[in-house]
Design a protein with these regions (language model features):
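Phosphate-backbone recognition surface of nucleic-acid-processing proteins
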Residues: 241, 247, 251-331, 360
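Short, basic/hydrophobic alpha-helical segments
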Residues: 56-73
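Glycine-rich, often acidic, oxyanion-interacting loops/wings at catalytic, nucleic-acid
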Residues: 147-238
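Short alpha-helix plus adjacent loop in nuclease-associated cores
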Residues: 91, 97-137, 143, 147, ...
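Charged, flexible boundary elements
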Residues: 1-18, 222-223
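Short glycine-rich, Thr/Ser-proximal phosphate-binding strand/loop in the N-terminal lobe
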Residues: 31-56
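Gly/Thr-rich phosphate-binding beta-strand-loop-beta motif of the actin/hexokinase/Hsp70
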Residues: 18-40, 122, 155, 252
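Short glycine-rich phosphate-binding loop at a beta-alpha junction
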Residues: 70-82
């Protein structure tokens, strides 16, 4: 009997290097140092290390974390301040960055408060799914508008303070000068005080100094407002076509949405971001909701200004006010409803422009 052996299939050679295990990075951010911790997908803490807040320190942190396995996700605290630069660096390295806001209170009560514990808690928040918010990119037109509005608000506040100081000093000057300036408008008063001669009197010198400071701050406010308007027109010009929306309100809402508005899952998430969504406060047989006092308060204030403008100028809004008033709602409650409607409209315009690819803004 002839026995014919069958050909044996060729098996692939065994891999010399096993696949790297997935790990998760958590970072507790500070001004001068970042503390990082690495955990496995099973929740085992591998190590924690401190790194300087420099470009070299960021690269060292990434290399250190990758030495433990395949790094695909990272939880970073304070992505809008101390952790902003690190979050951008990790995103450019194709790592999914998750914003971690609130610490794990149970873990803090159990292990105390240290930077290493906070870094570990950030990693575990990503692992458990408790932290799932995509941070703002911090690069683009919205980031430009944020710093411009920051400088503008600071200049407006300083100008108001200088005006109040000028009028306070004016009360104690020579009666003849005070009577000559008392009937002038604010603009004329500032212009006149800026041209007062230096007669050696401390009060007169202070009036002239404050008036010139106000004039300089006014120039700054106008220039910053012009740049904000230009940024909005180049980024989302369609927002300015909405009734009641001006450049400053549009900028506040765009800053809240960020340069990556696709991170917002729905208009409800945008409403919650702006603090115009009710919060459930039910228990047992009691079913109720309370006012949302969280969210971005500048965006909330922008929605309020838009609603107030519409109540004065928009026929549809005034008809809505009349109808809701007849139903027994107070004006404050009606304004809250209108703010939610405006947030829905703004969200649609932002997402529509984002899908079409809005142009970037130039400063």
């Amino acid at each position: 009997v002839t026995v014919t052996s069958l050909p044996q299939p060729t098996l692939p050679a065994p891999s010399e290097e096993p696949l790297a295990e997935d790990v998760i990075l958590g970072v507790d951010t500070h001004k001068d140092v970042h503390v990082a911790a690495v955990v496995t997908v099973l929740g085992v803490l591998l190590a924690h290390q401190e790194f300087p807040v420099t470009a070299v320190g960021y690269r060292q942190l990434l290399s250190w974390a990758r030495s433990f396995g395949a790094l695909r996700r990272a939880g970073v605290e304070c992505t809008g301040s101390f952790g902003a630069a690190l979050a951008r660096f990790l995103s450019r390295e194709n790592i999914c960055v998750v914003e971690v806001n609130q610490p794990d209170r149970a873990l803090r009560r159990k292990h105390g408060k240290t930077d290493a514990v906070d870094a570990e808690a950030a990693a575990r928040a990503v692992l458990s799914g408790r932290a799932d918010v995509t941070p703002k990119t911090g690069e683009g037109p919205a980031a430009d508008m944020r710093v411009l509005r920051l400088a503008k608000e600071s200049a407006v506040k300083a100008r108001t303070q200088a005006k109040n100081q000028l009028k306070a000093v004016l009360l104690g000057v020579d009666p003849v000068l005070r009577e000559a300036l008392s009937d002038l408008s604010n603009t004329a008063l500032i212009a006149t005080c800026a041209d007062l001669p230096d007669a050696g009197d401390a009060a007169v010198f202070t009036l002239r100094l404050l008036a010139r400071r106000i004039q300089q701050l006014t120039v700054e406010v106008k220039e910053l407002a012009r740049r904000v308007t230009k940024a909005v027109r180049r980024c989302r010009p369609q927002l300015l076509d909405i009734i009641g929306v001006g450049p400053d309100s549009a900028a506040a809402l765009l800053i809240a949405a960020g340069d990556n508005p696709e991170r917002l899952a729905s208009e409800a998430s945008f409403a919650a971001l702006c603090g115009v969504s009710p919060v459930e406060q039910s228990s047992g047989k009691t079913q109720r909701r309370r006012l949302n006092r969280g969210g971005n308060r500048q965006a909330n204030a922008a929605l309020y200004r838009i609603v107030i403008t519409r109540l004065r100028r928009d026929t549809r809004t005034r008809l809505y006010l009349e109808r809701r008033t007849k139903q027994g709602m107070s004006k404050r409650e009606i304004i809250r409803c209108l703010k939610r409607y405006v947030a829905r409209e703004i969200y649609g315009q932002i997402q529509r422009a984002s899908a079409l690819g809005a142009p970037s803004a130039a400063a």
